[in-house]
Structures are given as structure tokens and as C-alpha cells.
From Swiss-Prot:
GO cellular component, one term: cytosolic large ribosomal subunit
Database matches in NCBIfam families: rplA_bact (TIGR01169)
Name of the protein described by the UniProt record: Large ribosomal subunit protein uL1
Subunit structure: Part of the 50S ribosomal subunit.
tRNA-binding keyword on record: yes
The encoding gene: rplA
Family to which the UniProt record says this protein belongs: Belongs to the universal ribosomal protein uL1 family.
Organism: Xylella fastidiosa (strain M12)
Length: 232
């Protein structure tokens, strides 16, 4: 494929193995944007963990201060009553129990997040083969099993992201859009990293945040110099 002068310049701007200050990295990402749609900004974080060991698995959620820039559809399993009303008031797209489960079994799975109250898990448990492979199974570790579904819905709609270290010990997460202000992307990344530090497994030894790289949907990966971030 023939490269344009602009694309060649972008490729030359990113030196393999070099770490860039966060401000410069964001500018490179925005310069590299080439899709006809507004690209997402993704982060890949290599952790110093051995996920084969049960005490070194990392899973959690972060409420990004500037949101994700994405409209999120949320379904909530909760018995009828005040909590169901709270979930609807917070913007839930669907609320129910057995009736909602039946709709999902019939193919209505167009949701980004599924939330449940603890007493609704008896219903949700039957949907494991549907929700599990899609990453939608409610889990207390990421705030999707909650006694306060209204607050959980509000968080999901406001830009809460959920993540889990993969087999290689890498966290993949969206932290916004290239259309975001530079400062918004920076704050989102820092919030995510601070939360990851908080849930560092005690069994993890050595450097925990080994490598942090940003990329846009269609752009190159840019390694971040962590000393340019505020992680306190």
C-alpha cells in the first residue's frame, strides 16, 4: 500500500522502543488520526503479575473523570420496587427480573453493561452462557453487582470502564476519543492508573506498571514515559 507523505511523517515520529511524555504522545495520536470516524483512544498496560496465580489476577473498574465519549446501554436485574425505580430514574435502558431474562434468551442482548442486585443473581445465574462470553456477567469486583443499582447505572452512564488483565497480564481499556481535550485524556489515563495501583496484588513483586502505551483506533502505539504522569 502506498503511504502518503503525512503517514510517513507519522510513522517516523514514533520511534520503536522510545517513551514519550504524555503531552507529546497525545499530540502524536491526534496527528495520526486518519479514519473518517472519530477514533477511540485505547490504552494497553502491561502489569508485573502472573495471572496464572489466583492471587495475582487483576480486575476492577474506574469512573473516568471525563467519561468515555460513548453512549452506554444498561440493563438492570432488580425486583420491582424502589430500587427498580431508582435504576430507571438513573437512565437504565431496561429493568426487570424473569421477564428481562426471557428477552435476553430470545436474543435481546444489545447492552454494554448488565447490572444486578445481589437478590437478582438467582435469575442472572441462568444466563451465564449468554452473558459470560460477552463480558456482561455482573460481578461485584467491577461494581455491577450492587445494592444500589441507581448509583451503579449512573456510574456506567457517566463513563465507568471495567477491565481485567488478560493471559499476558495486559489491561486493555478505552479512555476516550481523539476529539477529547488533551487534558481530559490525560486525566482519564491517570485516574485509571491510580485505581490499578490501588488494587495491586500483594503477591506481585518488582515493577507493577511495566509498560503503558496509547493508540488511536487506526493509529500507531505510543509508549508513555510514566514520569510525566501524576499518579498520586
Amino acid at each position: 500500500m502506498v503511504q502518503t507523505k503525512r503517514q510517513k511523517a507519522i510513522d517516523l515520529a514514533v520511534v520503536p522502543g522510545k517513551s514519550y511524555g504524555i503531552d507529546e504522545a497525545i499530540k502524536i495520536l491526534k496527528t495520526a488520526t486518519k479514519a473518517k470516524f472519530i477514533e477511540s483512544v485505547d490504552v494497553a498496560i502491561r502489569l508485573g503479575v502472573d495471572v496464572k496465580k489466583s492471587d495475582q489476577q487483576v480486575r476492577g473498574s474506574t469512573l473516568l473523570p471525563a467519561g468515555t465519549g460513548k453512549a452506554v446501554r444498561v440493563a438492570v436485574f432488580v425486583p420491582s420496587g424502589a430500587k427498580a425505580e431508582d435504576a430507571l430514574a438513573a437512565g437504565a435502558d431496561a429493568v426487570g427480573m424473569d421477564d428481562l431474562a426471557e428477552k435476553m434468551q430470545a436474543g435481546d442482548l444489545n447492552y454494554d453493561v448488565v447490572i444486578a442486585t445481589p437478590d437478582a443473581m438467582r435469575v442472572v445465574g441462568k444466563l451465564g452462557t449468554l452473558l459470560g462470553p460477552r463480558g456482561l456477567m455482573p460481578n461485584p469486583k467491577v461494581g455491577t453487582v450492587s445494592q444500589n443499582p441507581g448509583e451503579a447505572v449512573k456510574n456506567a452512564k457517566s463513563g465507568q470502564v471495567r477491565y481485567r488483565a488478560d493471559k499476558a497480564g495486559i489491561i486493555h481499556c478505552v479512555i476516550g476519543k481523539v476529539s477529547f481535550d488533551d487534558e481530559a485524556l490525560k486525566l482519564n489515563l491517570q485516574a485509571l492508573l491510580v485505581d490499578l495501583i490501588k488494587i495491586k496484588p500483594t503477591a506481585s513483586k518488582g515493577t507493577y506498571l511495566q509498560k503503558v502505551s496509547l493508540s488511536s483506533t487506526m493509529g500507531p502505539g505510543v509508549m508513555i514515559d510514566q514520569s510525566t504522569l501524576s499518579l498520586k
